[in-house]
């Protein structure tokens, strides 16, 4: 698994959330990133909550998940559900 790709995914999610004025979620994800590393689950949940899921987000996480041999299966399923609900 490419740690930089995962980190970039979460950093980009933080930017997207800030654009949607989800500042509390963005700050939480930033704190988690600094303290514990990238919180993909939190990023996905926040993207879904704020209606920010796009095909591009799903494709990015699918590529990351493929590299990590299914490590993010649950997060990917949640993101896909968020896309279908959008």
Regions found by a protein language model. Name each.
Residues 77-86:
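Short, charged, intrinsically disordered terminal tails
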Residues 32-72:
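Acidic, low-complexity, intrinsically disordered interaction modules
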């Amino acid at each position: 698994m490419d740690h930089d790709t995962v980190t970039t995914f979460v950093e980009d999610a933080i930017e997207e959330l800030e654009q949607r004025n989800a500042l509390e979620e963005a700050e939480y994800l930033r704190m988690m990133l600094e303290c514990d590393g990238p919180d993909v689950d939190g990023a996905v949940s926040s993207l879904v909550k704020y209606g920010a899921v796009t095909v591009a987000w799903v494709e990015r996480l699918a590529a990351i998940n493929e590299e990590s041999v299914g490590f993010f299966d649950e997060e990917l399923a949640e993101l896909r559900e968020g896309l279908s609900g959008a």
